[in-house]
Amino acid sequence: MDIKLKRTYDPPETDDGYRVLVDHLWPRGIKKENLHADEWAKSIAPSTECRKAFNHDPERFENFVSAYTAELDSNPDAATFVTQLKQLAPTTVTLLFSDKDTVYNNAVILKKWLQAKLG
């Protein structure tokens, strides 16, 4: 299964496959009908405490990776999401995030975690 990352502000493309918003909050300035998301998986987004501890600081990213990965490992909704994605295979899945930083964000961590779980 191919897992892609894309900002919510980038236009949808035909090869995006199944599009999932993975942020806890709805992206500013985007109407629901304009996002073209198949799902909003906010229950597997990082907790408010985890996000605030990271505070978009690249120097704190390693700690954010550890904290968010631990949340995913203990979150039954994350396990259900993995099962759901297995049923979609071989469809491409695009994880949508609103962060301006395309390197240090929760979607990057989630993609790596999902790839490990999906094999």
Locations of the language-model features?
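Residues lining hydrophobic/aromatic ligand-binding pockets adjacent to catalytic sites
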Residues: 1-119
